[in-house]
Amino acid sequence: MPTADGKFGVGIVGTGWCAAAHLRAFAGNPYTRVVLMCGRNEQRARRKLKDFGAEVADVSFTRKYDDLLSAKDVDIIAISTPNHLHAEQAIQAAQAGKHFVLEKPTGLDVRELAKIGTAVRRAQVRTIVSFVLHYNPFLKFAYWLRESGRLGAIRYVRCQYLSRILESYPGWSWLKTARSGRSHLLAAGCHAVDALRWCSGLEPTAVSAYHTQFTKGYQWPTSIVVNLQLGRRAIGQVVSSTDYMMPYTFGVELMGDRATLRDDTIFWKDQPIDLDELRQANPFPEVTLKPGRALDGSSMIQIDCEMPASGNVRSHPFQGEIDELVNCIRQNRESHLNVFDAQKTMEVCLAADRSATNNGRTVKLPLIKQTGD
C-alpha cells in the first residue's frame, strides 16, 4: 500500500555499501520513499550508511526482518545482506506479497534457486536482481550493437571479471567464507556470466571449468576459467579472479561473422562498418564513436563512454535498476532482470563450480529442468 504521499514505501535489509546504493537510488526515484531499514545495531547502521553516502535521518529502524514483512507501508524490500541470507529473505518477501530488489547471488545452490522461483511465481510480485551493469552505457551499447545485427552471427564470447579484493573490502568478514562467499563466481564473477548471456543473446548449454587459489585469506578458490558451449556452434569463456596484480577489469568481447567488439573497440575484416551510419543509428547520446587505427594500420572504431571500470558500488548505475523495478510495478509488467532470468546466470555459476570441483568434467545445462517466468 503506497505511503500517505502516494509513493511506494521501501524497506531496506542490510546496512553495507550496497544498501547505501539502493537507498540513494530509491531517493532518486519520484515514486518511492524509504520508510524502514533493518539491521543489527541502529547506531552503527546509521553511521555506516551515512559514511557510504546515504541519508537515513528520516528512516525508521528495526532489528527484526519480520517487521519489514508485516509493515503495511512497505511495498518494496531491498535485500542486500550477506550472500547466505539472500534466498530465504527473498522467499519470505515474496510470501509476504512484497516486490523486491535482490543483490546477487540470488541463491547458493539449486534448491535455493528453485524455492525462490516457486515463491515469486505463486505471489506474482515484481522482482529485479542487481546485475547493475545492464545500465552501464558500454554494456547497453554492446547489447544493442549485437542485437542490431552489425556483428553478424556470434561465434565467440569472452567476459572477464578481474578484481583484487582483500581485507579492506566492505563485507570481507563474510565474503571470504565458504558459507557466504562460496566461490568467486557466486560472490563476484556472476556479473561476467550475466554479461555474457545478455550481450551475446546466447544461452550456455554446457560448461567445463578449472579453478585454483593464490590469494590467502579466502576459504574458496580465487580464480576460475569457464569454457562454455553456446547453442550448437558458438563457444564462450568467462574468467573470474581476485588474484591478478592489476586494476579492476571487466572485459567484454563479442566476435561475430561480420565484426568484433573487443572492449572499447570495433574491428572488422571483409565488411567495413560505416562509421557515419553507426553514429546516426546509435541510440545512446552518452556513447561517442570515433575513427581509429589498429596496430596493423587497419581502420577500426573507438567507443568513448563510461566503461565498467571500478568495483566500487558508488560508481555503479543503481538508479537505472531501481527505476526499472518501479516502472515494472507501476505498469504491472516483468523486468528483464527478474529472478527467473537471474536463475539462468546462477545455474551457469553453479555448474561451473561443480565442473571445477570435478577436474573439469563437463556439466550440462540447465540444472533446473523446468523454469517459469
Locations of the language-model features?
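Glycine-rich phosphate/pyrophosphate-binding beta-alpha loops
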Residues: 190, 216, 239-247
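C-terminal glycine/acidic-rich active-site capping loop/insertion
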Residues: 132, 253, 257-336, 364, ...
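Beta-loop-alpha module in the N-terminal Rossmann-like domain of NAD(P)-dependent dehydrogenases
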Residues: 58-119, 317
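C-terminal capping/lid region of NAD(P)-dependent oxidoreductase domains
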Residues: 152-156, 354-373
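N-terminal Rossmann-like dinucleotide-binding module
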Residues: 1-54
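Predominantly a Rossmann-like dinucleotide-binding segment in NAD(P)-dependent oxidoreductases
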Residues: 133-218, 224-225, 359
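Rossmann-fold dehydrogenase core element
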Residues: 115-133, 152-158
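Hydrophobic residues in well-ordered beta-strands that form the structural core
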Residues: 79, 102-103, 127-129, 238, ...
